[in-house]
């Protein structure tokens, strides 16, 4: 059901109030009226209108004073002022005090309606943006970072403190370990959360384009610069700029970046005007910047400016306790996105996932699960749904056999080991199916499916 917009009409002339109230009521508005500024303030506090239409010249309290009083308590509701005096000074003062717009009497009702509709549309957009910011802030809370790893839990605790500061941050780690995720979490938990978060990959652009992308350029600064263009430093003002793959930034641009970190100012390419910015810089790299400093390929002074706080993210192979957690998260995500009813990953498949070294880290795990979801036709992901390099036959718990075998023998070997693992865990848990499913990292429903497939009776274990 569409919400009814509430309008507050304030005018000391009875005929104007009646005319406007009738006109907006016919358009579906809930109308409220006041004949002076003081009464309007009481109604404003009581009914919380979506828009206010108010005359400027009124006894007791004029529209400008009433507007100032409204703005001292609440700044979001659009206020449109009406005046019979076509005075530029009055209009300027009204806008300076926070009016959305003003109209001059006598006015055309259609024109006034357009102004009111524009005010409501803008208000709706602002409300949606606030909700999006709130949703982003909620989705990037520390509790939403999936981990059972003590090392990652410590990083999350440290990062929560870092977010409250204004210090530059350097995030190191292999590709796919979640450097951008941590950078976003810092931003959305900081005082800059309502500002922009912008990412640029320093390795993705050649030097000339990267400079233009970062610093912007004036019209005519170089061939093809037909218009003025703001750079990312300018667009990230009051927000956060993530410089990904900072180790790939050319030395000449490193010097310009150092100035921004020190002075918070720069000039566009081809420009002479110094532009001040208020931004937080987060740099990310999968390279050893200290080694690059020794080699002379990275500026030492820039390294120390960026390295105020250094976070080192562990690779996925060093946080194996997170693999099943992340795999199940990606399973739910991609099943929903692809409208598939895939409910679980079977124990043998999960064992293979846990044993794999994951050179591509979390990004590789995400891709593997997405592929399995897309290609699978049943309710459970099995070992044969995994890529060949992962689904190698298991000799015993934790060991992967590397000798090549035929596809037929591979499936038989996987099923044999899977059955043995289920029986061993069932025996350890004294036939308790709920605890067995928990230990195997699968749902009770998936365990029942496997018990039936292999003809295992928990009472016989």
UniProtKB/Swiss-Prot annotation:
<keyword id="KW-0238">DNA-binding</keyword>
<keyword id="KW-0547">Nucleotide-binding</keyword>
<protein>
    <recommendedName>
        <fullName>Regulatory protein AtoC</fullName>
    </recommendedName>
</protein>
<dbReference type="GO" id="GO:0005737">
    <property type="term" value="C:cytoplasm"/>
</dbReference>
<dbReference type="Pfam" id="PF00072">
    <property type="entry name" value="Response_reg"/>
</dbReference>
<feature type="domain" description="Response regulatory">
    <location>
        <begin position="6"/>
        <end position="120"/>
    </location>
</feature>
<dbReference type="InterPro" id="IPR025944">
    <property type="entry name" value="Sigma_54_int_dom_CS"/>
</dbReference>
<dbReference type="InterPro" id="IPR009057">
    <property type="entry name" value="Homeodomain-like_sf"/>
</dbReference>
<dbReference type="InterPro" id="IPR002197">
    <property type="entry name" value="HTH_Fis"/>
</dbReference>
<dbReference type="GO" id="GO:0000987">
    <property type="term" value="F:cis-regulatory region sequence-specific DNA binding"/>
</dbReference>
<feature type="DNA-binding region" description="H-T-H motif">
    <location>
        <begin position="433"/>
        <end position="452"/>
    </location>
</feature>
<dbReference type="InterPro" id="IPR027417">
    <property type="entry name" value="P-loop_NTPase"/>
</dbReference>
<keyword id="KW-0067">ATP-binding</keyword>
<dbReference type="GO" id="GO:0045893">
    <property type="term" value="P:positive regulation of DNA-templated transcription"/>
</dbReference>
<dbReference type="GO" id="GO:0032993">
    <property type="term" value="C:protein-DNA complex"/>
</dbReference>
<feature type="modified residue" description="4-aspartylphosphate">
    <location>
        <position position="55"/>
    </location>
</feature>
<dbReference type="InterPro" id="IPR001789">
    <property type="entry name" value="Sig_transdc_resp-reg_receiver"/>
</dbReference>
<feature type="binding site">
    <location>
        <begin position="236"/>
        <end position="245"/>
    </location>
    <ligand>
        <name>ATP</name>
    </ligand>
</feature>
<dbReference type="InterPro" id="IPR002078">
    <property type="entry name" value="Sigma_54_int"/>
</dbReference>
<comment type="function">
    <text>Member of the two-component regulatory system AtoS/AtoC. In the presence of acetoacetate, AtoS/AtoC stimulates the expression of the atoDAEB operon, leading to short chain fatty acid catabolism and activation of the poly-(R)-3-hydroxybutyrate (cPHB) biosynthetic pathway. Also induces the operon in response to spermidine. Involved in the regulation of motility and chemotaxis, via transcriptional induction of the flagellar regulon. AtoC acts by binding directly to the promoter region of the target genes.</text>
</comment>
<dbReference type="Pfam" id="PF00158">
    <property type="entry name" value="Sigma54_activat"/>
</dbReference>
<feature type="binding site">
    <location>
        <begin position="173"/>
        <end position="180"/>
    </location>
    <ligand>
        <name>ATP</name>
    </ligand>
</feature>
<dbReference type="GO" id="GO:0001216">
    <property type="term" value="F:DNA-binding transcription activator activity"/>
</dbReference>
<feature type="modified residue" description="Phosphohistidine">
    <location>
        <position position="73"/>
    </location>
</feature>
<dbReference type="InterPro" id="IPR025662">
    <property type="entry name" value="Sigma_54_int_dom_ATP-bd_1"/>
</dbReference>
<dbReference type="GO" id="GO:0016887">
    <property type="term" value="F:ATP hydrolysis activity"/>
</dbReference>
<keyword id="KW-0804">Transcription</keyword>
<keyword id="KW-0902">Two-component regulatory system</keyword>
<keyword id="KW-0597">Phosphoprotein</keyword>
<dbReference type="GO" id="GO:0000160">
    <property type="term" value="P:phosphorelay signal transduction system"/>
</dbReference>
<keyword id="KW-0963">Cytoplasm</keyword>
<dbReference type="InterPro" id="IPR003593">
    <property type="entry name" value="AAA+_ATPase"/>
</dbReference>
<dbReference type="GO" id="GO:0003700">
    <property type="term" value="F:DNA-binding transcription factor activity"/>
</dbReference>
<keyword id="KW-0010">Activator</keyword>
<feature type="domain" description="Sigma-54 factor interaction">
    <location>
        <begin position="145"/>
        <end position="374"/>
    </location>
</feature>
<dbReference type="GO" id="GO:0005524">
    <property type="term" value="F:ATP binding"/>
</dbReference>
<keyword id="KW-0805">Transcription regulation</keyword>
<dbReference type="InterPro" id="IPR011006">
    <property type="entry name" value="CheY-like_superfamily"/>
</dbReference>
<dbReference type="Pfam" id="PF02954">
    <property type="entry name" value="HTH_8"/>
</dbReference>
<dbReference type="InterPro" id="IPR025943">
    <property type="entry name" value="Sigma_54_int_dom_ATP-bd_2"/>
</dbReference>
């Amino acid at each position: 059901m569409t919400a009814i917009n509430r309008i507050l009409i304030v005018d000391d002339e009875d005929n104007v109030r009646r005319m406007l109230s009738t006109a907006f009521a016919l358009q579906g508005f809930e109308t409220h009226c006041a004949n002076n500024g003081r009464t309007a303030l009481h109604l404003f506090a009581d009914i919380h209108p979506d828009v206010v239409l108010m005359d400027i010249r009124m006894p007791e309290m004029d529209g400008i004073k009433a507007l100032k009083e409204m703005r001292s308590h609440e700044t979001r509701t659009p206020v449109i002022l009406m005046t019979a005096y076509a005075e530029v000074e009055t209009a300027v003062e009204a806008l300076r005090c926070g009016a959305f717009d003003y109209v001059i009497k006598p006015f055309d009702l259609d024109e006034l309606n357009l102004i009111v509709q524009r005010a409501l549309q803008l208000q709706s957009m602002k409300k949606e943006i606030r909700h999006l910011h709130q949703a982003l802030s909620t989705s990037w809370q520390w509790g939403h970072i999936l981990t059972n790893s003590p090392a990652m839990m410590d990083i999350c605790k440290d990062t929560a403190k870092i977010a409250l500061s204004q210090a530059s941050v350097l995030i190191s780690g292999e590709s796919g370990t979640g450097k951008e995720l941590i950078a976003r979490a810092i931003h959305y938990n900081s005082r800059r959360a309502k500002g922009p978060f912008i990412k640029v990959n320093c390795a993705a652009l050649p030097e000339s384009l990267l400079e233009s992308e970062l610093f912007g350029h004036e019209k005519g600064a170089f061939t093809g610069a037909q218009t003025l263009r703001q750079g990312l430093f300018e667009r990230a003002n009051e927000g956060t700029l993530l410089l990904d793959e900072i180790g790939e930034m050319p030395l000449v641009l490193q010097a310009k970046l150092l100035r921004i970190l020190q002075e918070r100012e720069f000039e566009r390419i081809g420009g002479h005007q110094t532009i001040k910015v208020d931004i937080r810089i987060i740099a990310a790299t999968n390279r050893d910047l200290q080694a690059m400093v020794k080699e002379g390929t990275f500026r030492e002074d820039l390294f120390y400016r960026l390295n105020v706080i250094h976070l080192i993210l562990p690779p996925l192979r060093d946080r194996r306790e997170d693999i099943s957690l992340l795999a199940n998260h990606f399973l739910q995500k991609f099943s929903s996105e692809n409208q598939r009813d895939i409910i679980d990953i079977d124990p043998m498949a999960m064992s293979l996932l846990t044993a794999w070294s994951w050179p591509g880290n979390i990004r590789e795990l995400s891709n593997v699960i997405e592929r399995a979801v897309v290609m699978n036709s049943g309710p459970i992901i099995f070992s044969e749904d995994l890529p060949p390099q992962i689904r190698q036959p298991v000799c015993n718990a934790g060991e992967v056999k590397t000798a090549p075998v035929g596809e037929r023998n591979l499936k038989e070997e996987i099923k044999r080991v899977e059955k043995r693992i289920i029986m061993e865990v069932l025996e350890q848990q004294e036939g308790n199916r709920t605890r067995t499913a928990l230990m195997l990292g699968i749902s009770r429903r998936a365990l029942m499916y496997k018990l039936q497939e292999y003809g295992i009776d928990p009472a016989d274990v």
